[in-house]
Regions:
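ATP-binding N-lobe of GHMP and related small-molecule kinases
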Residues: 1-131, 135-152, 157-167, 171
């Protein structure tokens, strides 16, 4: 998968110099679904299924998202100067919501970034495909922008905050 991500990144953005690679697993709750956001107990387990990403900083304020799973949608472009959910962003509202949540929490990004993803979690399967994408995005932002103060728990909570408040989805 590493080679395919880098190849697609190079095809889309001219080269793959300075690109970092990432992975975020999906998860299953062994004691049932929909208990997390209803205040119930959870017993999650990470999976080998997940979301892979390649990313690097840009020299402007633009953010480019591309999903190898949704080639027909092409590159989705957003701006750090307009952190709003737009219908035309489609699936990219999930990672862009994490960018928004970082800003809401006081972590501003000095420049944009390019990101290519591919995932093998079936959408709607209850295996947390959106959470995987949100945590992946959080890890990418933490790494690219040197935000060392954030823990993995912080990143998970930022993902939840973005999905609840930017995308309007009740999740845990």
């Amino acid at each position: 998968m590493k080679e395919k991500l880098l190849e697609k990144f190079k095809e889309l953005f001219g080269n793959a110099d300075g690109v970092s690679l990432y992975f975020s697993p999906g998860r299953v709750n062994l004691i049932g679904e929909h208990t997390d956001y209803n205040g119930g107990h959870v017993f999650p387990c990470a999976l080998t299924l997940g979301t892979y990403g390649a990313a690097r900083k840009r020299n402007d304020r633009l953010v480019h998202f591309y999903s190898m799973n949704l080639d027909h949608l092409g590159v989705i472009e957003a701006s750090l100067d307009e952190l709003v959910n737009k219908k035309e962003y489609n699936w990219a509202n999930y990672p862009f919501g994490v960018v928004w949540a970082f800003a809401e929490k006081g972590y501003t990004l000095d420049c944009g970034f390019d990101m290519v993803i591919w995932g093998n979690i079936p959408n709607g399967s209850g295996l947390s495909s959106s959470a995987s994408l949100e945590v992946l995005t959080g890890v990418i932002l933490k790494d690219l922008y040197g935000i060392d103060a954030l823990s993995m728990t912080d990143l998970a909570l930022i993902g939840q905050y973005s999905e609840n408040n930017f995308n309007g989805c009740n999740c845990g």
